[in-house]
């Protein structure tokens, strides 16, 4: 972390608000600590750096709130797209309120947000059957510690390779 800070000329306040995520197959594999050795990072992993959201910086460390992994997919959880992220799950919060916070976090709003289906993926397994979440549900009660929240919606940034495959399959 100090090397990154020096190379990017980042002040101490900024570097303290950055978190590193190790991602594989479109899902957050783990959060990397400041002391995590670079030599331990697998070459097949992607590393994302993100600024800590405001709500996490002000979160009470003694509360039962926890961080969960989230990812985007289309039709099947194994068809992931976009950048996965970590989100603060508040204990006892109804999903309608959680969805509003997710909207702020992802930038998905209005009609686009209405098209998104939210599902819990048990154990974070790519081939697990999604357990869809309703607005009245309390997400903290539906999710175990190793579950992930999935956002099902169309991939707006399709690669040319996906188009090529689609044309040749027909």
Map each language-model feature to its residues.
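Cross-family signature of deubiquitinases and ubiquitin-like deconjugating cysteine proteases
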Residues: 1-170
């Amino acid at each position: 972390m100090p090397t990154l800070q020096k190379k990017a000329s980042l002040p101490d306040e900024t570097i303290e608000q950055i978190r590193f995520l190790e991602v594989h197959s479109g899902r957050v594999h783990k959060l990397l600590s400041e002391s995590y050795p670079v030599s331990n990072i697998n070459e097949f992993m992607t590393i994302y750096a993100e600024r800590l959201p405001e709500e996490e910086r002000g979160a009470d460390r003694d509360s039962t709130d926890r961080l969960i992994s989230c990812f985007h997919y289309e039709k099947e959880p194994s068809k992931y797209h976009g950048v996965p992220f970590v989100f603060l799950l508040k204990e006892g919060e109804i999903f309608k309120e959680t969805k509003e916070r997710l909207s702020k976090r992802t930038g998905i709003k209005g009609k686009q947000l209405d098209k998104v289906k939210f599902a819990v993926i048990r154990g974070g397994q790519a081939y697990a059957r999604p357990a869809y979440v309703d607005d009245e549900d309390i997400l903290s009660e539906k999710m175990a510690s190793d579950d992930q929240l999935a956002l099902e919606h169309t991939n707006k940034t399709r690669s040319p390779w996906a188009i090529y495959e689609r044309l040749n399959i027909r």
